[in-house]
Amino acid sequence: YSRVIATYRTVLEDCVIYHKSLNYEQLLSDTKELYYSCKTSLELFDMLHNMRSVEDSVYAHSLNVSLISRRLGRWLKFSPEELDTLTLAGALHDIGKLKIPVEVLNKPGKYTDEEFALVKQHPKFGYDILKSLPLDSHVKKAVLCHHERSDGSGYPTGLSQSDIDEYAAIVSIADVYDAMTAARS
């Protein structure tokens, strides 16, 4: 688990901070290896609960969302190719957060209105990073739309039900689940 978080840190920072190519094959390979090391859903969720590293919250959270998304896709009978796309969507869903200053992102307590407005831009920042890359459109839509809600109350564009990509909806569920079960301040 810790090794894969280190991979996420390296791959995502190399892309966003150092402007290197996105090594999404490495993210997918390492995530799948970790996923298949868990024999059951219980073992997977137990690992997520017990192994979270608070200091690497963006990276641990991205890994967790990727693993949970893959499990949800398996339950929904996705094909192997669809599972890989969904796994990558989960892995990259918060890549835009790397464009937000660390002191804002890791601030304990509530954000100011200005800080929250900035944090709410991370889906758009992420989409802008990925839009020209040769990734499945579901990955890009999941990155952009994982905070959209079926009632139209989400962001960044306030999409509702049928306008939200299926992969984005699944990543959104995984994202909310992981956030709700995290020990965050």
Indicate where each model-derived feature is located:
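Signal-transducing alpha-helical linker
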Residues: 3, 23-26, 39-43, 87, ...
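Divalent metal-dependent catalytic cores for phosphoryl transfer on phosphate-bearing substrates
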Residues: 48-53, 60-61, 78-142, 178
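Non-catalytic interface/linker regions that flank or bridge core catalytic/transmembrane domains
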Residues: 1-52, 56-57
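Alpha-helical phosphate/pyrophosphate-handling elements in metalloenzyme active cores
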Residues: 55-86, 158-163
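Histidine/acidic-rich helix-loop-helix segments that form or flank divalent-metal centers
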Residues: 90, 130-132, 136-171
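Buried hydrophobic packing segments
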Residues: 69-73, 126, 130, 173
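A short mid-domain helix/strand-loop element embedded in enzyme catalytic domains
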Residues: 28-47, 64-67, 92-101, 147-148
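Conserved beta-strand-loop-short alpha-helix elements that form
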Residues: 169-182
